[in-house]
Regions:
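Catalytic cores of the polymerase beta-like nucleotidyltransferase superfamily
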Residues: 1-241
Length: 241
C-alpha cells in the first residue's frame, strides 16, 4: 500500500480508498486479475475492480533522461495516492496498442511531464512522489512502514514538505500546487515556507495544466467536506488570481 491511505492510517484517519504500488508491470497485473483494465498513456496504471471498489495499481517509477515531447495528455498521476480521478481517463489496451519506440519519460519545454512510464524500484519510486507525507509504503508481507523521507514525522507534525526542489516539482506538474492547497485544508497541514514561496512564484504554470486534471482537482477541493477551508487556502496562496 502506498500514499494517502498509509498517511491517513498513521494520523488515525479512515482512508477513503487504498492504492497499491508494485514491481509488476501493468501488463503483468492485467494478466493476474480478470477484472482489470489498463488506463492512461501519460501514466500507465492498472485498475482492478473488486465489487464496487476500484483498486489502483501503479508500477514503481524511476528517473530517466527526459525527452522533449508532444502535446499534453490529461491522464491521472500515480504519485497521488488518492484513488482514481473522477473524470475517466483514456483507456489503454495493452493487447492492441503499439507503444514501441515511444519515449518513456517526456517533458515539455517548461519542464512539465507529458509521459512517465519509466519503471524502476521502490527506492526509485519514493523520489518521484510529491510530498513527504505521501511517500509512505506499507509492506503487507511484514506489516512494516517504509519511510525514506521522514514522511511519518512530517505528517504527525502536520507539515507539508516537498520531495526535491519545489520549483522543479511544480514545473513537472503544476497541479501539485492545487494538491498542496487541498492537503493544507483537508488535513490542517502547514505548507513548508519554500513550498509556499514556490507556489506564489509559479502559480501561472497552472494555465498550462490539462483542463481535465484541473476539473478533477477542483472537485476534490470543494466537494469533499472542506470547501470553505479550500477556498481560504487557495486565496492565501494566490491560486485564485
Amino acid at each position: 500500500l502506498v500514499g494517502g491511505c498509509v498517511r491517513d492510517l498513521l494520523l488515525g484517519l479512515r482512508p477513503k480508498d487504498f492504492d497499491v504500488a508494485t514491481n509488476a508491470l501493468p501488463e503483468e497485473v492485467k494478466r493476474l486479475f480478470r477484472n482489470c483494465r489498463l488506463i492512461g498513456r501519460r501514466f500507465r496504471l492498472a485498475h482492478v475492480f473488486f465489487g464496487a471498489e476500484i483498486i489502483e495499481v501503479a508500477t514503481f517509477r524511476a528517473a530517466s533522461a527526459p525527452a522533449l515531447g508532444e502535446e499534453p495528455l490529461a491522464d491521472l498521476d500515480p504519485e497521488e495516492g488518492e484513488g482514481p480521478e473522477i473524470s475517466e481517463p483514456e483507456e489503454f489496451d495493452a493487447d492492441i496498442a503499439d507503444t514501441e519506440g515511444e519515449d518513456s519519460h517526456v517533458l515539455d519545454m517548461h519542464g512539465r511531464i507529458l509521459r512517465d512510464n519509466a519503471y524502476g524500484t521502490i527506492d526509485d519510486d519514493v523520489w518521484r512522489r510529491d510530498f513527504t507525507a505521501n511517500a509512505l509504503y506499507y509492506n503487507i508481507a511484514d506489516f512494516s512502514v517504509w519511510d525514506d523521507v521522514d514522511g511519518a514525522d512530517d505528517g504527525r507534525a502536520r507539515g507539508l514538505k516537498m520531495i526535491g526542489d519545489p520549483e522543479t516539482r511544480f514545473r513537472e506538474d503544476p497541479v501539485r500546487m492545487l494538491r498542496a492547497a487541498r492537503f493544507a485544508a483537508k488535513l490542517d497541514f502547514t505548507i513548508d515556507p519554500p513550498v509556499e514561496a514556490a507556489i506564489h512564484a509559479f502559480s501561472g504554470l497552472l494555465a498550462s495544466a490539462p483542463p481535465a486534471r484541473l476539473f478533477d482537482e477542483t472537485l476534490k477541493l470543494f466537494l469533499a467536506g472542506h470547501g470553505a477551508k479550500s477556498f481560504s487556502s487557495l486565496r492565501r496562496l494566490g491560486l485564485l488570481e
